[in-house]
Regions:
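Conserved small helical "lid"/interfacial subdomain of P-loop NTPases
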Residues: 140-160
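Conserved P-loop NTPase "ATPase switch" module shared by AAA+ and STAND
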Residues: 72-98, 106-113
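Phosphate-binding P-loop
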Residues: 23, 34-47
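Conserved AAA+ ATPase "SRH/arginine-finger" region at the nucleotide-binding site
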Residues: 131-143
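Short regulatory helix/loop adjacent to the ATP-binding pocket of P-loop NTPases
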Residues: 115-129
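Walker A/P-loop nucleotide-binding motif
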Residues: 44-62
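Dynamic helix-loop-helix/coil hinge segments at AAA+ ATPase domain boundaries and subdomain interfaces
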Residues: 7-29, 166
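C-terminal helical "lid" of AAA+/P-loop NTPase domains
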Residues: 165-169, 176-188
Length: 188
């Protein structure tokens, strides 16, 4: 029996604002898009400091990747601040203070808890509360199905509604887990 050849469609597209399924997080998405737009135009944004938090699978790393991919030199992006060592926390605190005097720069920090519940240096927690704070909400069933089908289409796969429904009923319901399943399907 001949071995089945696998088709390599390549890696999935990198995270960007256009392939982020916002669901109830539209305000956060629009605000971060506008931030990048303002910075790229050389404008001083009305708000320069942001803290975005949410549970695993809510889209934090996707948005952090989209901000990084925007290649905006005046934008500092920090993901998983909740995992920072004390030394990295101090460095971030000092960097935050330095950015205060740079009106054409912005900082977006992502974590898994609201600022007041983070186990970080108190002075850093205080700074994270200064700007806009967004709580990312997990996608509801319809938005999760849309995100799953969109991610599959980007890989050249057509799941169909029946398979999407099956996956949502019988697997973990976060995008990271669902994308891992899509990776497996893509390799078949």
């Amino acid at each position: 029996m001949d071995a089945q050849l696998t088709l390599d469609f390549g890696p999935p597209p990198p995270p960007c604002f256009d392939n982020f399924v916002a669901g109830a997080n539209l305000e956060c998405l629009a605000t971060l898009r506008h931030l990048v737009y303002s910075l790229k135009r050389g404008e001083t944004p009305a708000q320069r400091f942001f803290y975005v938090w949410g549970p695993a699978g809510s889209g934090k790393s996707h948005l952090a990747g989209a901000l990084t991919a925007s290649q905006c030199p005046n934008l500092m992006v920090v993901d998983d601040v909740d995992r920072y060592s004390k030394g990295r926390q101090r460095t971030l605190f000092h960097r935050f203070n330095a950015l205060i005097d740079q009106p054409d720069h912005a900082l977006v920090v992502f974590g898994n808890q609201p600022p007041a519940r983070l186990k970080l240096l108190p002075e850093l927690v205080s700074r994270l509360s200064w700007g806009m704070v967004f709580s990312l909400q997990p996608l509801d069933d319809n938005a999760l199905a849309d995100a799953l089908e969109q991610s599959a289409r980007e890989r050249g796969l057509n799941l169909g509604q029946d398979l999407s429904t099956y996956l949502l009923r019988h697997t973990r319901r976060d995008m990271a887990s669902l994308k891992t399943i899509l990776d497996g399907l893509d390799r078949l």
